Structure formats: structure tokens, C-alpha cells
């Protein structure tokens, strides 16, 4: 568990996904056995850590299962009960097997697994890739096969593997050591008759540094090994000092940097939902849920379930938002626009609908008109039906939708696209994921990276052929000529200079120069491995090279 890592961006964010084509070859989907069917949509359920930390016992989990089965959470899709750290004895048994703490779990974990399964839940557990867990209990290093078999024999089908107490062995960097250990676990799980869902915490141990290269590198391999990855800081625990809202926003910002990795079978994990945290307002709790749902992020509640209010149960079981979260396309909502106050995000859904999510980060109520063109809807004379996913009310819109949001509130609309108006061009910010600066089009055909300001000049369309053009000047296209990057007429004969590809490393590569877009003075340079100035976020819907 990583706590206290500083927020890496106050303004930046990023992501991508799949639907149009910015490249020729789609990126292969992996799971812990190279099968996205193992976890095609993000997990939903309960974990004790953020609410109770090491104060866990058998009664907590039986009471949680009983309540979730009765209050609608299980039936809404929250079907996993997961233990976190501190469940085990301080010593392994004589044969090296892990043992549960018999005081905390007098009936044993196999008994508890049967109990929660009888209530309609899956059962998950926590371990660590080091020699000790974060809480000082036995880690799985050099016991991987034995522990995997133990967990399976207990009826467990989900493993959260933390990364405390991992040290580089001779001849390896720390990143290489983590890759070896998590890769070995992947091999162990792949050989099992019924592989466990594999939640990897490795990226969290590389987040929040001055140089993101190792963090990006770890993010490159976690989708190959498992189904979800805890990528950054821990969400603030119930008893922790500091602002719970700031903690949510910190993890939200981290998640926006990583959308290019997510697809069916692998999900970015910005950590638990904390709906009973006393430091959150009602709007902040609802925003936390709505943003995670829009991301198609794991919805794992860490709260005292029996004491949740009716209002908290109501938003946690919102069918329309859960349907977005569980949408089989598994796109992450990405930034269409951003300024100091509003984040506007969008994504596509499997049936062709378009999602609009708007977050008010400011401290006062905000009213704003949002053009449908910012959402990737470019056809004229169209009327769309927009459903408010909080209350189910619908409205007809044509060129814009009007939003009024209280401080720290989030609006979510699902737009139905009528026949003849159903084409979508991936649209949104192109921004550097280290600095958070947005690519900005100027009227003199120049481009620059500037602080994100919500202007149309920072919103870009990405066409199926790999052409990138600003919404403010749709007849102009981003082009490279030698080291120079500029806007030029889209009908230029220099077609290769206007074609870009986007690999999973986050580079924007130009077909003519074979170089990479580089922040700074905005120029083309040789492509370097996961260099901060060359890693960018693009709109959802752009397919990876």
C-alpha cells in the first residue's frame, strides 16, 4: 500500500481507448491467462482496507455479506467480498503454508469462503510479492506456487498482490525485480485449472516521482500479467489525516493519465470507493461514484456496509451508472476539455451511445453550455436525446447541452444518437501526461503546449486515417516537416506528414519523419523510451498502434 505520494498534476490528465483508428494494428488484449473473458468488465464488491485497515475479523465479513445480500448491493452487481492485509498469522506452518489468524477468524477462511459464496459472493484475498506484507505478515516471495494452491484450496478466486518489501536482486533494477515477481505470479496463475483474478499493485510503487519512465514501464507490462492494477496512491483511509476529497481528486487525476492501457479484460484501478467517509459531502460521495463509473474502474466499496444510509445505497445501486461502468466496450472516459473549474469527459458505449461526464472542481456553482462537437458529434441538423443518469430525465439537444453544477458535483448524461447522426470522431485534449499541458492551436498555423484553459483551440479531432485537427480550425491539420510541427491545410499533398500513430507507450509518431512529437517548443525528435516529454493522452476512441 502506498500512502502520501504527492499529487502529480493539478491540471493535467490523459487517456485514449478504441473505436476509430490512429493506427493499423490493434494492441493485443491480455489477462492473467491471455483471456479477457476472465474479467471482461470491472469487478464490483467490498474490501475492508480503507475503512478498517487491520481491524478485521470474521464477524465483519459475515455481517457485510449478510447486509449486502439484503440491501440490494449484491443484486446491483457488488458480488465480491475481499480480505486485505492482516488476515494471517505472523508465521507460516511447519510445511511453509500460510495460516489465518485463528483469533480473528475462528472458523477459518475455508469456512468463511463457503459462507460468503452461499450468500452469492465470490471470495478474494490479499498477499504481497515481497518477503513481508505491508503490515509485517509473511509475504509470498519464494512461496508463489504454494500460496496460489493454498488460496485455491480455500475457495478463493481473486488475489490482490501488493508490493511492499521488494528489493532489487543483483543485476536487476527495481522495475525489473517487480516485473520478474509479478511475471512469475502470472505464470503460476496461468497454470491453474481455475486461475485467480490477479490485481497488481506494482505500479503504485513507481508513481509520483520526478521522472515517470519507470512508472510508464510498469504500466506497459501489468496488462499482460493481470486483470487490474492499482496504479498510484492509496485512497485516504477512514482514520487518516487530510482531505478525503483531495485524495479522490489525486487518484482521479492519476487515472486520467492511463486510459490507453484499458480495454476488456484489463482495468486501471484508482482504488476504493469510500461512501461513508465523514470528510465528504453528499455531492462529493456521488461524484466519486460517478467518476469511477464513467472510467469503467473497479467499484470496490470500503465502508461499514450495515451503517450506509438509504441515500448512499441509492447512488451506489444506480442502475444507469452501473450499466455504464459494466459496459462491454470498457472504454475509459477521457478529457474533452479542462480548465481550473470544469472537467468535461466523454466516451462511447457498446450500443453506440455517447457518454458525457462533467465535474465541477470549483467551490461555487457553475453554469456552462457544452457544444456537442466537443463530444465527437460532428454532423449538422441532428437532434440527440440526452438522459440524465442521476434522475432518468431526458431532454432533446442539437448543438449544445446546458449544465448547472454545484461545487464538487458531477453530471452524467447518456446521449442516444439517431439514425443518420450516429458517426463519432474521437475528440478531446491532446496533452502531455507528465506536465499536464494541452496542445493548443494558434491562428497563425503554429501550435504550442499551454496550461489547459477550456478553450476550443485545445480540443482536437482524431480521424480514422490518423489525422489530428483542432475543433477551432477543422480545415487545418497537425503536420510534421523535419523537426517542425505546425498546422497546414488538410488537403495538402503532404499526406504522410499529417498522419500520426499512437502506440501503447503514449508516443505520437509521425508517418513522414518517423519521429515523435515532443513537448517544449513542440517539435519532432527521435523517439525515446517512455520519455516524459513524449508521452501524451488522446481522446477515447483512438485505437492503439
Curated annotation (Swiss-Prot):
Main location, first listed in the record: secreted
Disulphide bond pairs: 54-86, 134-164, 438-452, 477-490
Enzyme class, UniProt record, top EC level: hydrolase
Keyword Secreted among UniProt keywords: yes
Signal peptide (from-to): 1-31
EC number: 3.2.1.22
Domain Ricin B-type lectin positions: 421-518
Induction comment from the UniProt entry of this chain: Expressed on galactose and galactosecontaining oligosaccharides (lactose, melibiose, raffinose, and stachyose) and polysaccharides (pectin, xylan, gum arabic, gum karaya, and locust bean gum).
An annotated GO cellular component: extracellular region
Subcellular location: Secreted
Family, per entry: Belongs to the glycosyl hydrolase 27 family.
Function: Hydrolyzes a variety of simple alpha-D-galactoside as well as more complex molecules such as oligosaccharides and polysaccharides.
PANTHER family linked to this entry: ALPHA-GALACTOSIDASE A-RELATED, ALPHA-GALACTOSIDASE/ALPHA-N-ACETYLGALACTOSAMINIDASE
Protein name as catalogued: Alpha-galactosidase A
Species this protein is from: Aspergillus niger
